[in-house]
């Protein structure tokens, strides 16, 4: 078909048919040009950078337990004893026993609560001259108390004993002293020694005290530390001595401690200087 024939047929059509058939080919001219939905800045375009992609929505976290996955909630491990013992640098049990024993030893340690009589020689000599007997020195070692006693040589036959209580004079025991040969012959003084073991268990509320007595020619002479006795107290109580004043009641020949127990000495908690112990034991002269 030639172009002339097409043009002829188009011209022969009615005007209404021509507009209806080819109406879709006529479109209105837009008033404004369309803009792109994404625009790059001039800086990004110049540098060649690409705009970042849109961030995806975060996935919400979920918590799931082991039992939901078919697993156990607990894990049990069983340890069996080794066939060969471990080579430890020290024995833990022995170390703990040592710590406990040290703590117990500190709480049960005792100290002398009086000064050494022979430390003041002039006073010691005057006491010996007046009372004919006097404790010379004393020391505490390994749950035992040991010391020496000086007496005037009034006769050949003589007896020296330590009267000691471990329960605040509810009961007492007499321990004989042993004669010590004097270095210098012909002295008018004799020396006796004693060594007394302390009980394993002593109640904390009880007091240990002792006095010295000397029997000669049917007479008995006492050294009771001027009526106060020689006391042995626990180490932790040493710092608290002197807090209680001595008893100021009438002199009836007997006194009572703070628990109401009778004692053969006078006064309560007098102030005495402390003594840690002598390394050597022996006569003063």
UniProtKB/Swiss-Prot annotation:
Residues bearing PTM Phosphoserine: 261
GO CC annotation, single: protein phosphatase type 1 complex
Tissues/organs with expression: Highly expressed in the liver and, at lower levels, in skeletal muscle, including in vastus lateralis, gastrocnemius and soleus (at protein level). Highest mRNA levels are observed in skeletal muscle, and only moderate levels in liver and heart. Weak expression in placenta and lung.
Segments carrying motif PP1-binding motif: 62-65
InterPro entries in alphabetical order: CBM21_dom, CBM21_dom_sf, Pase-1_reg-su_3B/C/D_met, PP1_3B, PP1_regulatory_subunit_3
BP GO annotations: glycogen metabolic process; negative regulation of glycogen catabolic process; positive regulation of glycogen biosynthetic process; regulation of glycogen biosynthetic process
Domain notes: The N-terminal region is required for binding to PP1, the central region is required for binding to glycogen and the C-terminal region is required for binding to PYGL.
UniProt name for this protein: Protein phosphatase 1 regulatory subunit 3B
Organism encoding this protein: Homo sapiens
């Amino acid at each position: 078909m030639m172009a002339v024939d097409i043009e002829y047929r188009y011209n022969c059509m009615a005007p209404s048919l021509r507009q209806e058939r080819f109406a879709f080919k006529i479109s209105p001219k837009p008033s404004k040009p369309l803009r792109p939905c994404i625009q790059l800045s001039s800086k990004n375009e110049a540098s060649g950078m690409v705009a970042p992609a849109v961030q995806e929505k975060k996935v919400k976290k979920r918590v799931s337990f082991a039992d939901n996955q078919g697993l156990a909630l607990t894990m049990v491990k069983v340890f069996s004893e080794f066939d060969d013992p471990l080579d430890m640098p020290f024995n833990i049990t022995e170390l703990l026993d040592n710590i406990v024993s040290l703590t117990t030893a500190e709480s049960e340690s005792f100290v002398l609560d009086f000064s050494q009589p022979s430390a003041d020689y002039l006073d010691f000599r005057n006491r010996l001259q007046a009372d004919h007997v006097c404790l010379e020195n004393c020391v505490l070692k390994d749950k035992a108390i040991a010391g020496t006693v000086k007496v005037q040589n009034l006769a050949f036959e003589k007896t020296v004993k330590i009267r000691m209580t471990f329960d605040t004079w509810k009961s007492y025991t007499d321990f004989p002293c042993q004669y010590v040969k004097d270095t210098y012959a012909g002295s008018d003084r004799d020396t006796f020694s004693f060594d007394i073991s302390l009980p394993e268990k002593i109640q904390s509320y009880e007091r240990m005290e002792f006095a010295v007595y000397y029997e000669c020619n049917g007479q008995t002479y006492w050294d009771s530390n001027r009526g106060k006795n020689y006391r042995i107290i626990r180490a932790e109580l040493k710092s608290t001595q002197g807090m209680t004043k001595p008893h100021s009641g009438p002199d009836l020949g007997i006194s009572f401690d703070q628990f109401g127990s009778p004692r053969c000495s006078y006064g309560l908690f007098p102030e005495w200087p402390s003594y840690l112990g002598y390394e050597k034991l022996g006569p003063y002269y």
